[in-house]
Amino acid sequence: MSTIKDLNLAPSGERKIRWVEAHMPVLRDIGSDFAREKPFAGLKIALSVHLEAKTAYLCRVLEMGGAEMHVTGSNPLSTQDDVAAALAAKGMDVHAVYGCTDEEYQAHLRSVLSVGPNIIIDDGGDLVHLMHTEFTDLIPQVIGGCEETTTGIHRLRIMDRAGTLRFPMIMVNDADCKHLFDNRYGTGQSVWDGIMRTTNLVVAGKYVVVSGYGWCGKGVALRAKGLGAKVIVTEVDPIRALEAVMDGYEVMPMMDAAAIGVIFVSVTGCKDVITLEHCERMKDGAIVSNAGHFNVEIDMEALDRCADEIYEARHNIDAYRLPNGKTIYVIAQGRLVNLAAGDGHPAEIMDMSFAVQAMSAEYLVRTRGQLKPGVVSVPAEIDDNIARRKLKAMGVSIDSLSCSQKEYLNG
């Protein structure tokens, strides 16, 4: 039996799913293939991804392929209750409620793992971690899994180096059709959508501090610049810092940037990027947000412990009045700003990311028993297939190499 907020919310969620389906042509095309070929017939898939409409459509595409789906969210504040209800109303096993406690969140993860999945689709690594700590007896029946995020892949690589990862995990985030588009264009747009709809403040003319200049940070900085902000980048990697300088941004240590910025976006995948000491240096009224996976980039524990007063300033914005008299505003409790305070990436972008997930899951079944435990790259042919499908859907044609050109390039 599903664990959701209210089944009566299903019609609203169904409308959302139909909308994204109309704007995800590649995934729709793959769904048609799956419906015909049934690659997942007789298999159980456990999925933990931010549970909103685009994820719901991915679940339905996998179900078209014959999978028995067991679904939960990957963040308590990103679940959309109406979408969860829409899936449950059609008979899918769903365990996700917006705003659930950490204990309830863990219970939801356990619910989808307890069925004994054959494939795991993860976002941040929580399912895989729990499988290796509490459900080890079920590991032999796991064919493999797919990981969506930079943070999750980081956790998997640690396990892989330690020799503790006991089944193959495909690094979906590292696929070109994922990180070059989802991380840069998707994050860039959705982060500012979340910040602007939550604060209702202008970005133009303000100093924006972007912590981290990976693909996600590049996207956030680019869109901030396009909105008229004066962008400062903080980094620990000298190569990325140099990239930011060459891209026209100011680069400085976080302690220096803290005294200048008005809006802060942490997008590193690391912990304690914005600390209490940084917050104490910020201007009165500074706005702090996180676009990394977990709510550890901002030291929320220190803020909760040291603030003289904490109150809700606006829906999804908490005010922290510090002992020095300044008030700092934190969006969505320091959780993912684009999902906890918005609808996540545009459907057209997630069309490619979730196409990689779907085709990678099918690849796991097709190569069952051939892949060794550990992290596995997305095959180049999957990237190529998805890119060609996307171009076709967009009505874009490209050239192809002639025989003589191929001979020249191949020696």
Regions found by a protein language model. Name each.
Residues 2-40, 71-79, 84-206:
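Glycine/serine-rich phosphate-binding loop and adjoining beta1-alpha1 elements at the start
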Residues 66-68, 92, 138-140, 167, ...:
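A short helix->loop->beta-strand "cap" motif at the edges of active sites that frequently abuts
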Residues 73, 120-123, 136-151, 270, ...:
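ADP-ribose/adenylate-binding Rossmann-like module
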Residues 49-67, 178, 182, 186-261, ...:
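Glycine-rich phosphate/diphosphate-binding loop of Rossmann-like nucleotide-binding domains
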Residues 47-55, 75-79, 125-127, 215:
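Gly/Ser/Thr-rich loops at beta-strand to alpha-helix junctions
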Residues 11-26, 40-44, 52, 167-205, ...:
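Adenosine-phosphate binding glycine-rich loop
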Residues 115-116, 259-260, 281-284:
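Alpha-helix C-terminal capping/helix-to-coil transition sites in glycosyltransferase folds
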